[in-house]
């Protein structure tokens, strides 16, 4: 297969959802359909000796944080799919946001009993930065769910994206019978108890088929009425609008019952884009360019001090990686030979023989690689669009031993370069303030300061609720702003001026009072 064909068959996507919407279960079932797992291990089935392939393995746990979970590659039909995991609950961090900059499409999973939830809203905001195409899976149809029409309306209102239903549920909870596939004009019947295996559901072709009435009884007439209503009230699928991030195809199903996941995957490989062109400071890089290039979007540190390896995750943007090839680390101006990059075939770390645009490879990193770094076959490029996000949680960090302030500063700056947290130094005092988007980030920092930098630190509350990067076109206006609000200003790890607001009201007032100053939620790496 030539370079062009290899790239065209790739689909790189991430799953976004609120915790407990069923993301891990759907990841399992996606891998099951991709032939990567013979029998899906549901997350809760720990006692049955199966546990989730994409959750942390015991062996991985013993030596720190799992890296296998982060990327899973598997074949599906004629495509090769790269699924990037975005962590759930506590380990939610900026990594989650940045992972979304490394994909070409996203699958949004919604708990149909609850509808659109807060984490989903935040993640969707991030996909908007690049108008990423979104496919929606309404999950948990084997439970009592909200009215499906209401769910579509909520997605449209809250997330500002048009919905085009592709499948439609027949019944719900204990009375869930299956779905009607609008594009194929067929009913696919649901069988219970098949959650761990692939099921060939019985299909009935055509809404007017009398067989439907025999199998579904009165539900058949209800379905016909609903579909008629739906066709008048909802959007038809439009591929161009989907690619522009304006419309989402919606599938209904139950990941736990392994039903509907294959319909969604069929849609994903048929409609989601293959690797897309990427913006750099010099030019657009096309995926099919002959020469290799890529950027680092995430660094995974190993929590175990005995294994000081950190893995830098690199999204290949163009060309082909081959084992042992020489590539340029552009920021350092250094050529390096990469002999031991990792690929991630569905949960197993393996030496990468080769990788193509759209694939993710892992580079061993001993502290020289930073988030946002570009690697190329010699060309001086920098990929743009790898942002820092304004943190939402803040703590002041204090040393137990005041004599170690040099080590503390060094440690914090290195950890912030790696994207573990953000560090702010107020202009008016010598405090060090740490900012994060997830609580776990704080624990990781204290742990790593102690094990890697021999610094014992504790946190204290600090009166900061949100942060914005600030700049102004007119230097005089910026100077005046700095004079007037100096008690709210800090420098971040890269010496960028930041406004730390004690409350959201304070921030709004500052934005109104200083119209010539730009307050930004994101900053480029």
Curated annotation (Swiss-Prot):
Cell compartment(s), UniProt: Cytoplasm
A single GO cellular-component term on record: cytosol
Report which superkingdom the organism of origin falls in: Bacteria
Indicate the segments annotated as coiled coil, or none if absent. Answer: none
The record's CDD domains line, in alphabetical order, gives:
RF3 (cd04169), RF3_II (cd03689), RF3_III (cd16259)
The tr-type G domain extends over: 8-276
Any one Gene Ontology BP term: regulation of translational termination
Residues that bind GTP: 17-24, 85-89, 139-142
What the entry lists under Gene3D superfamilies is as follows: P-loop containing nucleotide triphosphate hydrolases, Peptide chain release factor 3, domain III
Q: Keywords assigned by UniProt?
A: Cytoplasm, GTP-binding, Nucleotide-binding, Protein biosynthesis
Q: Main subcellular localization, coarse class? A: cytoplasm
Q: Which Gene Ontology molecular function entries are recorded, alphabetically? A: GTP binding; GTPase activity; guanosine tetraphosphate binding; translation release factor activity, codon nonspecific; translation release factor activity, codon specific
Task: Report the transmembrane regions from the record.
Answer: none
Mind telling me which InterPro entries this protein's record contains?
EF-G-like_DII, EFG_III/V, G_TR_CS, P-loop_NTPase, PrfC, RF3_C, RF3_dom_3_sf, RF3_GTP-bd
Function in brief: Increases the formation of ribosomal termination complexes and stimulates activities of RF-1 and RF-2. It binds guanine nucleotides and has strong preference for UGA stop codons. It may interact directly with the ribosome. The stimulation of RF-1 and RF-2 is significantly reduced by GTP and GDP, but not by GMP.
Family (UniProt) = Belongs to the TRAFAC class translation factor GTPase superfamily. Classic translation factor GTPase family. PrfC subfamily.
Q: What is the protein's name according to its record?
A: Peptide chain release factor 3
